[in-house]
A protein has these predicted regions:
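Bacterial Sec-dependent N-terminal signal peptides
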Residues: 1-22
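N-terminal, active-site-proximal structural segment of metallo-dependent hydrolase catalytic domains
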Residues: 19-114
Length: 115
């Protein structure tokens, strides 16, 4: 019985030591509030009138493109020093619709990532 206990203790110790030498893959996740990322097109059923060219924010295509550019620069820089491949998962808030997210990930700063 003692030999059996010693054997399993040795086997378990070797297994732990071998497992410690395995290579690890690092992934990064982030959450970012995009702060009212709206395009200039009205979506039926949504209260997005402030973000139209004649709305209270005078939201234009130029402003929209500038915001996309700036946000894509920031998001692509997150965790770049830790993980060269970039973020594995990005959670976002305050986005108008799927089309706006597609525009964001199509920006040159984010085009090389697999979104």
């Amino acid at each position: 019985m003692r030999k059996l206990i010693v054997f399993f203790s040795f086997w378990f110790s070797v297994t732990i030591v071998v497992a410690q030498n395995t290579e690890r893959k690092l992934y990064s996740i982030a959450f970012y509030n995009l702060e009212n990322l709206f395009d200039t097109i009205h979506d039926a059923g949504k209260n997005d009138y402030d973000f139209l060219p004649d709305g209270s924010y005078r939201w234009t295509a130029k402003k929209y493109e500038a915001k996309l550019h700036n946000l894509s620069d920031v998001l692509s820089a997150l965790s770049r020093n830790l993980v060269p491949e970039g973020l594995a998962v990005i959670g976002v808030a305050e986005v108008e619709n799927h089309r706006v997210l597609t525009d964001l990930v199509s920006q040159p700063a984010m085009a090389n990532y697999k979104f």
